[in-house]
Amino acid sequence: MVSTIGIVSLSSGIIGEDFVKHEVDLGVQRLKDLGLNPIFLPHSLKGLDFIKEHPEARAEDLIQAFSDDSIDMILCAIGGDDTYRLLPYLFENDQLEKVIKQKIFLGFSDTTMNHLMLHKLGIKTFYGQSFLADICELDKEMLPYSRHYFKELIETGKISEIRPSNVWYEERTDFSPKALGTPRVSHANTGFDLLQGNAQFEGEILGGCLESLYDIFDNSLHADSTDLCQKYNLFPDLSDWEGKILLLETSEEKPNPEDFKKMLRTLKETGIFEVINGLLVGKPMDETFYNDYKEALLDFIDSNIPIVYNLNVGHATPRAIVPFGVHAHVDATEQVIRFDYNKES
């Protein structure tokens, strides 16, 4: 299904740095072993400083990745914190719209904003893995659960269903060459946790990293983020959210419970929780603040909205891949999310 995969640095330029070369080389070999032809878009390997200083170059790479018909799939290198800066270079003169076509696009974290950009143009994307975080896993192989979903995506162009992983892993503290071939510390995983509401609900999924969504409404991290996101209407209208399932997951920053509540409150003020069909929430990295987040969700979200917590989606490992814009049937009792590509939500 997928033959050539184009790797883009839309947030951080870290994959161009020497200190991650052992990871990048490993990831490239893994993609080749899967029968893929990986190519790096022209600016993707230019390093942290160049990528930070040149949002227009990042935008050029994304435009090229969509316009180049030899590229079947676009894979984000890694997240970061300022991909919102691509907005004017993609939308001011309809630059992206002129070349846009349905292609597999995969990324997570700060890439949440890129997913929303593509959603504006009607593109269905896939949330949940990136090149450096997943393909370049330092163990002898990709994490088996993560590999299962990546393999299904490249072989079929779809994800048919998501079930819980049997295990979860602690985040590594050492990413140096010394860590090559070493396993992560693993723990038994307890599956999807229905916090409230109906165990079965359905709709198209959209959302992503809570901190990234919060930055659309709060400019304490970047002074111009709210202005740019507002100018280009990045956050979908409430009419767009109606009947959807919101996906939320937290980053490696592991926000403390008060910040988690503040971000939930900001989302609540948009009115989104009045129109969605349900909420899916990823496992926090290292299960930090697991119960605090659970309590906050129950406090803030209206009791009629189903909440399923502890998905293997987001910054905790291993990672499933979630199709956005595809009709999803969630069944917390049966512990499965099924996707129906023939049904319009």
Feature roles, as predicted:
Residues M1-S70:
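ATP/NTP phosphate-donor binding region
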Residues D259, R265-K268, E274, G278-S345:
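ATP/nucleoside-binding phosphotransfer catalytic cores, i.e., glycine-rich phosphate-binding loops
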Residues M73-L75, L106, I245-E249, L280:
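Structural motif
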Residues I205-T250, P255-P257:
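Oxyanion-binding "anion nests"
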Residues K124-E211:
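Conserved anion/nucleotide-ligand pocket segment
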Residues E92-K120, K124-A133, P306-I307:
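Short, acidic/small-residue loops that bind anionic groups at enzyme active sites
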Residues S67-F91:
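Long, hydrophobic/aromatic-enriched structural stretches that serve as scaffold segments
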Residues K21-V24, P55-A59, E92, F260-T266, ...:
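Charged helix-capping and loop-helix junction motifs
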